[in-house]
Structures are given as C-alpha cells and as structure tokens.
Amino acid sequence: MEKIRKNKIYKNIYELNINFGKSKSNKNISENYIFNGRSVSAICFNRKLKIFYFIQQFRPNYFFNKFKVKPLEIVAGGIKRNESSRQAINREINEELGVTAVSLKKIDSLIIAPDCLEEITDVYLAEVPVIKKFEINNPKEGEFIKIISLKKNEALELVNKKSTQNLVTKYALLKIRDIKI
C-alpha cells in the first residue's frame, strides 16, 4: 500500500513523497503536483430554436501553437472558494452568455489530463433562454466573448473535422449526438 506525504511548496503547488510499499526494494519517488482545483462546463441549448450555444474567446495556447486563436468552446470556468459546482455553472453561464439557465442537469465529471492538468470538470446540460446579444465583454475577467449558435447538424459536422479542439468541447460535441431537443 502506498504512503503519500504532501508538502506545500507554494500556493497550489505541492511536493508529493510517495512510498510504494513496505519492502526495501519498493521505490520511493518525489513528484511536484499543481492542484488546479475544480471547474465546470456546460452544453448550452435552446429547445425552442433547437440550437446549441458555443463561445469564442482568445486563448494564448492556441496562439503560441499557431492554431486559430479563438477556438469554438462550450461555456466553462473555475469554481470559486465557497461556491458549489451548481452555483459556479450558473455564474459562468451568466458571465459568458448573459442569461440565466432555465434548467441544469449534471451529466458527467471528467479529469482533463491525468498527470498533466489534474483539474476535474463537472459537465452540465443547460437549457437557456433565447440569446439576443452575441458579444459579451468582461474586462475584469479578461474575457471578450463572441457567442455562436449552431443547429445540431452543424455541431455534429464539427465532430468529423480533424482540427485541434479542447477536450471538453470535443466531448460536448460527441454528447450532442445523443441530446434530443
């Protein structure tokens, strides 16, 4: 059985000292770990118009890797201290789409990239009202968002494209196949 000792190095950075058993032949390792906390994501749709809402905003990683700098994404963000997952996704939908969700259902939890980015995101299905304003500017958060509406068949066409996409949005596009609106 492993014994794990955790030493805080700085804010959310830890050194983990791991012993993989009782015998002397077992390995002891030391590994640095960045705890990114938890986040939320939402597949947002409007039942009346039969559309899904996505967002586009500047992403430095896409810029440095010479991809399209404003990738298509689903609504997502971090969970703040003393905030529940449900409160966080409601806040993110309001910040990024400018509306309040009509209904919310948690459908999954995903570890984004084990051993690299240990962040866990809770994925929700969110019915939202018709959106009339398609740009959201939130300078305090560094967000200048363009809202994109897609019909189900348009969203499904993106599944077959071989373009680089973030994991959670790719997951959402695959889940849209099963969603009946």
Predicted feature locations:
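Conserved hydrophobic/aromatic beta-strand scaffold that supports enzyme active sites
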Residues: I13-E15, I43, F54, V123-L125, ...
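Structural motif
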Residues: F52, V69, E118-V123, I145
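Active-site-adjacent beta-strand/loop module that shapes the phosphate/pyrophosphate-binding cleft
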Residues: Y14-K24, A113-K133
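Short loop segments at secondary-structure junctions
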Residues: G21, N46-L49, F58, E127-I131, ...
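Nudix hydrolase/Nudix homology domain
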Residues: K68-L72, R81, K140-I181
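Conserved Nudix-box catalytic region and its N-terminal flanking loop in Nudix hydrolases
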Residues: I34-N36, I43, I51-R91, E141
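The catalytic Nudix box helix
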Residues: I74-I107, Y124, K140-E143, K151
